[in-house]
Amino acid sequence: MARYDARLRGIGKAHACSAFAGHDFEGRNIMKTPWKFLAQLASRRRSASVQENFIAPDTDPEVIESETENKSPLPFDKPTQASGTPDHDSAVDRGSMLSDQLESDPNPLQEMNLTADIQEPGTPARSETKQSDAAGKRLGPQSQTSANSQKKPEIRCRERSKNARAEGVAQSAVATNEAETVQTSSSGDPFFNEVAILDEEIKELRRLLAQKLYLQNAQLKKMLERFDAS
């Protein structure tokens, strides 16, 4: 046992010395120069940074969102391409229909002009109806004002005719009174003359009173007509 322990101790010392000297247990030279050591450190750092750059885009959520946003518009571009085909097909169909119409109808332009010119006799044009409506709206207030103006002259003419009649009656009464006074003055009795004069004055007063009453009635009628018109 003592011998075995001594051997182990000797082997350990030899291994420690060889490691310190830069040799492994088998005796190979493992010492490294400082330049090699620095080169290995730099290569390790570069490899670590490259791995981080490759791994970071996969794990960063912001980068993932940006990639999804950039990729999302791609499916929406397909409907535009698909929508372009129906337009082209519709244009082709229209062209074929027009060509068929041209072949079937020798003079399509003449028929189009005839259909545009022909209108129903009972239905007037829209422009004419609009003009007639505008003219009716414009003439509406004018017709009302003209009707009111026509009514006013008629009322005035009636009033003037009534006044003229009253004046004619008064003048005839005055003429008869003058004739009677001439006849009484020709007679020689003074009593009869005074009685005749009094009768004439009474008649004159009655005439004036009747004339005033007539004028007052005419004024009242005017006021009532104005009140009704308002």
From Swiss-Prot:
Which residues, if any, are the signal sequence?
Answer: 1-21
Is the Signal keyword given for this protein? Answer: yes
Q: Which UniProt keywords apply?
A: Plasmid, Signal
Q: Where is the composition biased (Polar residues)?
A: 141-150, 173-188
Q: Where is this region: Disordered?
A: 47-190
Which intervals carry biased composition (Basic and acidic residues)?
A: 151-165
The UniProt family comment states: To R.meliloti RA0936 and y4aO.
Protein name per UniProt: Uncharacterized protein y4nF
